[in-house]
Every structure is written in C-alpha cells, then in structure tokens.
C-alpha cells in the first residue's frame, strides 16, 4: 500500500468519524426543553407542550423521529387527528431551536 492510499484511507475515516460525531439521536432531544412561550417534553411516543400562560398542557402522539446530521424531524398527530411534522436543529451545549416553517417562527429552547 503506498503513502497516497494510506493518506486517502485515513482522510475517509476522519470524515466518517466526524459525521458520526455530529449524528443526532433520541438522547439529544429526549426530556424537557424550556422556551420563551412554551416548554416541551419529548418522550418516545409523546410530545407534551406546556404553555407559560397557564393554559392546560397538550399531549401529542409522536409517530416517527427522523434523525439527520444535526436535526430531528418529528412526525406527530395534532389535536384534530392530522399528521404534522416539526424540525428541531442547532443542537449545541444544551440548546436547540425549533426551525421556522412558512408562517411559523424559529423558536429557541434550552435544557430545563
């Protein structure tokens, strides 16, 4: 094996390790997150939304977690039985953000 092949193999291994280190998993999103307007609690099958204005909490059924590099797309059933999805990303040091979509704003969260 020549030096160029070894260098290429080491580089490919480094890239793969870096991608794996950034991979998002359930442990990254599980548990309670606090935001400006709501707090979220992620469990394997449910998302609980707690409002800061004393409205009753909403509990939604999660049908699927889709993990990508530094994001999680959650498919869930809303209050009228329609499936919706929400993307959470920017995981770093106990922080994350619900990504904006259409008329819905980006919402930052931190671990409670």
Q: What is the meaning of each model-derived region?
A:
Residues 51-55:
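Extracellular beta-rich ligand/substrate-recognition surface
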Residues 9-17:
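Bacterial N-terminal signal peptides
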Residues 20-34, 42:
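N-terminal helix-cap/turn-to-beta initiation motif at the start of protein domains
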Residues 1-8:
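Bacterial N-terminal signal peptides that target proteins for export
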Residues 26, 33-35, 57-58, 81-82:
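Short solvent-exposed loop/turn micro-motifs enriched in small/polar/acidic residues
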Residues 36-39, 48-50, 69-112:
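Beta-sheet ligand-binding and adhesion/scaffold domains
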Residues 58-67:
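Extracellular/luminal ectodomains and secreted, surface-exposed scaffolds of diverse proteins
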């Amino acid at each position: 094996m020549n030096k160029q092949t070894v260098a290429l193999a080491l580089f490919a291994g480094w890239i793969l390790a870096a991608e794996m280190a950034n991979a998002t998993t359930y442990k990254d999103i599980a548990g309670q997150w606090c935001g400006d307007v709501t707090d979220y609690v992620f469990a394997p099958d449910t998302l609980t939304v707690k409002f800061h204005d004393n409205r009753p909490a909403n509990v939604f059924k999660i049908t699927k977690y889709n993990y990508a590099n530094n994001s999680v797309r959650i498919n869930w059933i809303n209050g009228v039985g329609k499936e919706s999805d929400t993307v959470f990303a920017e995981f770093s040091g106990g922080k994350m953000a619900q990504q904006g979509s259409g008329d819905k704003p980006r919402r930052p969260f931190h671990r409670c």
